[in-house]
Amino acid sequence: MFCEKAMELIRELHRAPEGQLPAFNEDGLRQVLEEMKALYEQNQSDVNEAKSGGRSDLIPTIKFRHCSLLRNRRCTVAYLYDRLLRIRALRWEYGSVLPNALRFHMAAEEMEWFNNYKRSLATYMRSLGGDEGLDITQDMKPPKSLYIEVRCLKDYGEFEVDDGTSVLLKKNSQHFLPRWKCEQLIRQGVLEHILS
């Protein structure tokens, strides 16, 4: 059936939970592109035959194939665009270093796009706020307090706070730290916020 593979790509994204990135379906995308190539070649052949032979009975078939081509293109672009939006959101959620599990689900071109986006965002943040720049990825929601209590979920090592003091983050240790310094580690799964 026409457009079935393209619709399966869309269903695959729809089934993935929000904030999750399913594995890049290179095989499915290749099948859609092969179907589009076959439809285009059939249409070219029928258009040439309709022009030279005066066969107007081929026009509905040509239009149907053309509509299938357009639908396949829309689905393919929607699949790729939705993946880019999810990858962009991952940069804001996890920071500049993605976990291996997420990188494994990305195509090489998507990793390249992520790295370019990461560089562009870093350049923009350095251009704000004078010499030090401004990290706009922090405090996505306004904090209720400046310091929070956190528990370390795995051994991390030394962690330096702005005033120059160092804290040793060992598994199951608890600390009272500035919220904005902890948010990145919380997203990475190193720390968890202890709610009283």
Curated annotation (Swiss-Prot):
Pfam families in alphabetical order: PSF1_C, Sld5
This protein's name: DNA replication complex GINS protein PSF1
Family according to the record: Belongs to the GINS1/PSF1 family.
Disease annotated for this entry: Immunodeficiency 55: An autosomal recessive primary immunodeficiency characterized by chronic neutropenia, natural killer cell deficiency, recurrent viral and bacterial infections, and intrauterine growth retardation. Postnatal growth retardation is present in most patients.
Aminoacyl-tRNA synthetase keyword on record: no
Induction summary: Significantly up-regulated in aggressive melanomas.
Cell location: Nucleus; Chromosome
Record keyword Glycoprotein present: no
Protein's GO biological process: DNA strand elongation involved in mitotic DNA replication; inner cell mass cell proliferation
InterPro entries named in the record: GINS_A, GINS_bundle-like_dom_sf, GINS_Psf1, PSF1_C
Keywords: Chromosome, Disease variant, DNA replication, Nucleus
GO annotations of cellular component type: CMG complex; cytoplasm; GINS complex; nucleoplasm; nucleus
Functional summary from the UniProt entry: Required for correct functioning of the GINS complex, a complex that plays an essential role in the initiation of DNA replication, and progression of DNA replication forks. GINS complex is a core component of CDC45-MCM-GINS (CMG) helicase, the molecular machine that unwinds template DNA during replication, and around which the replisome is built.
Subunit-level organization: Component of the GINS complex which is a heterotetramer of GINS1, GINS2, GINS3 and GINS4. Forms a stable subcomplex with GINS4. GINS complex interacts with DNA primase in vitro. Component of the CMG helicase complex, a hexameric ring of related MCM2-7 subunits stabilized by CDC45 and the tetrameric GINS complex.
